[in-house]
Design a protein with these regions (language model features):
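Short, Lys/Arg- and Gly-enriched loop/turn segments at beta-strand edges
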Residues: 50-62
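Structural detector for short beta-strands of small beta-barrel domains
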Residues: 1-13
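Short aromatic-glycine-enriched beta-strand elements
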Residues: 14-20
Length: 114
């Protein structure tokens, strides 16, 4: 099945990600996943017996859980994850790098220099 990524979130306290995806039939899911690849807006996911392909390439991700999309649930996830990249503040520096489990920021934000 083919899915288009609409939004994404990073959870620095768990080192996992969330992606809001939709199908051609307008079925929407929230995917909770971990792995070495950060799924971004506009990416195309294909799922099947082969696993998960992103933009036509196999990627190392593990889907932990899939939730039916609910705007309240998505906003709850977003409000409880303290990552400046989740708010599209990509030109800023991160002051939360010490508590973040990602060795390299998925958004490419630099740690705040003290």
């Amino acid at each position: 099945m083919e899915w288009v990524v609409e939004k994404q979130l990073v959870c620095p306290s768990t080192g996992t990600f969330f992606a809001l995806v939709s199908s051609a039939r307008n079925l929407k899911l929230i995917l909770w996943y971990k792995g070495s690849y950060f799924i971004r807006n506009g990416n195309i996911l294909n799922t099947g017996y082969f696993g998960v392909n992103i933009n036509g390439r196999a990627r190392n991700i593990e889907i932990i859980h899939a939730f039916p999309f609910n705007p309240v649930l998505w906003n709850t996830f977003k409000s409880t994850m303290s990552c400046p990249g989740n708010d599209a503040l990509l030109s800023c520096e991160c002051n939360l790098a010490e508590s973040c489990l990602f060795k390299i920021c998925p958004y490419g934000i630099r740690p705040l220099k003290e």
